[in-house]
């Protein structure tokens, strides 16, 4: 939502878009050793952790009919793409591409926020606002580390039911009830008390997978 507010965020036209995908390698450069033609790979906007390559490579530039198009770091909205090896990861060809295609952003963002950024521990509570692709990935990440409860918050009952299939222990429809009150009710710690001698409540960690003012205020 803040794109264009700072100079470094200004978009350069013409631009080629897309930042996650799965495809088959057709050709590699002479310095590329971790993948080969014929390999199924994932293209992601996050560079691989290569000690010898600490700086992300420059944006790709493509000659088009009426000028030059530039990408942020990768582009995937195309039949073919050219990517620096830092952004290419080999994947199991037996996994459906519908699954691997979203790992490069949605899964890494949601699950990564829970596992790597927040470092949620077993038994800690997590509330996740918005259970689309990123939110569902956060739910899976929370389940993987043994979080409890895992509270999914959304406006769609169908999505909330789907989130439970991924590991959410509770679903809160924010269109029908106050999500803040619901989260407090589900996270009461009977052995901890505040200055008013009331049981402490509230999620240990909350993930905002929507990014609007209302959810941010509710989370805070």
Regions found by a protein language model. Give the residues of each.
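Single conserved hydrophobic/aromatic residue that forms the stacking wall/gate
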Residues: 1-12
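Adenosine-nucleotide cofactor-binding segment
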Residues: 128-131, 143-218
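Short, flexible surface segments
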Residues: 34-37, 109, 122
């Amino acid at each position: 939502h803040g794109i264009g507010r700072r100079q470094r965020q200004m978009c350069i036209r013409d631009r080629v878009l897309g930042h996650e995908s799965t495809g088959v390698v057709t050709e590699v450069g002479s310095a590329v050793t971790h993948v080969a033609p014929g390999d199924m790979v994932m293209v992601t906007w996050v560079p691989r952790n290569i000690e010898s390559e600490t700086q992300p490579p420059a944006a790709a530039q493509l000659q088009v009919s009426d000028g030059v198009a530039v990408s942020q770091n990768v582009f995937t909205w195309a039949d073919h793409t050219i990517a620096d090896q830092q952004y290419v990861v080999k994947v199991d060809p037996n996994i459906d591409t519908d699954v691997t295609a979203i790992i490069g952003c949605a899964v890494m963002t949601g699950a990564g926020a829970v596992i790597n950024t927040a470092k949620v521990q077993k038994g800690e509570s997590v509330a996740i606002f918005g259970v689309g692709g990123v939110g569902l990935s956060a739910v899976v990440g929370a389940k993987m580390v043994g979080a409890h409860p895992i509270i999914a918050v959304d406006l769609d009952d169908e999505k909330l039911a789907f989130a439970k299939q991924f590991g959410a222990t509770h679903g809160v429809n924010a269109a029908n009830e106050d999500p803040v009150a619901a989260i407090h009710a589900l996270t009461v710690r009977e052995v901890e008390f505040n200055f008013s001698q009331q049981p402490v409540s509230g999620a240990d960690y909350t993930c905002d997978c929507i990014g609007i003012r209302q959810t941010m205020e509710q989370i805070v």
